[in-house]
Regions:
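Non-catalytic C-terminal accessory region of glycerolipid acyltransferases
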Residues: 1-90, 172-173, 177-207
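Weak global preference for isoleucine
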Residues: 5, 57, 86, 92-94, ...
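A broad, low-specificity signal marking well-ordered, structured residues that form hydrophobic/aromatic
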Residues: 24, 46, 108, 134, ...
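Anionic N-terminal interaction surfaces
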Residues: 65-133
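Phosphoinositide-binding peripheral membrane targeting modules
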Residues: 119-185
């Protein structure tokens, strides 16, 4: 859970620069991708664009909530505690007007911004397979382009999930390796949600 701290970077962008990669939901209201960096970045603060709760982070990766005057309230807690709070939040289905061939009883949880989808046909080459949006449902990881759906992977068949530096999500399906770079979006959000839905499916429950 430790964030890499590069002195040359945090002087320009503050200690909170990578915080939203891990805290992809507001710890207070649960809004997805709700936390935004507060300017100037030297304040080392993030604020929720939905409920306006704010936090400050220090060099030891501890956070404290911030009052309306921008002062910490003294309730410092380690970053892993906040991450655990997010993992304990229930998954909330969302809606879309885009047609992705959802089946009866299938629920949608995540939609990405436009992304590239890479596929490894032969080791070690990863090549661009498509450009479109990723959709995560209670049953499948779907990638939709303007021309169709090149990938509709059942969650039970997705394995080897990992997140690499640069917010790249890797996974395998039917013996092939795939990669989706999630620039300016938390890849960990996708990793955690896929894992939670897989675990819920094995238990016969919702996420």
């Amino acid at each position: 859970y430790e964030l890499p701290i590069d002195p040359s970077k945090y002087r320009r962008r503050g200690l909170a620069v990578n915080l939203t990669r891990l805290l992809y939901r507001c710890p207070s209201c649960g809004t997805q991708e709700g936390l935004k960096l507060v300017r100037p970045y030297s304040t080392n603060r993030v604020e929720c664009s939905s409920c306006f709760s704010a936090w400050v982070i220090d060099a030891t990766c501890r956070l404290a909530s911030v009052d309306e005057n921008g002062q910490d309230e003294g309730n410092w807690a380690p970053l892993p505690d906040y991450y655990s709070r997010i993992l304990a939040m229930p998954l909330i289905p969302i809606r879309t007007e885009l047609r992705i061939g959802m089946e009866q009883g299938e629920e949608l949880y995540l939609i990405s911004r436009p992304r590239f989808l890479f596929k490894q046909e032969q080791f070690p080459n990863l090549r661009v397979l498509a450009f479109g949006r990723a959709f995560l449902t209670s049953r499948r990881l779907i990638f939709r382009t303007r021309l169709g759906i090149p990938l509709a992977a059942p969650l039970a068949g997705i394995g080897a999930l990992s997140v690499d530096p640069g917010d790249k999500l890797h996974f395998t399906h039917e013996g092939k390796l795939y990669r989706i770079p999630f620039r300016n979006e938390s890849a960990l959000k996708w990793f955690d949600t896929i894992r939670r839905l897989q675990q819920a499916a094995r238990r016969g429950q919702k996420g």
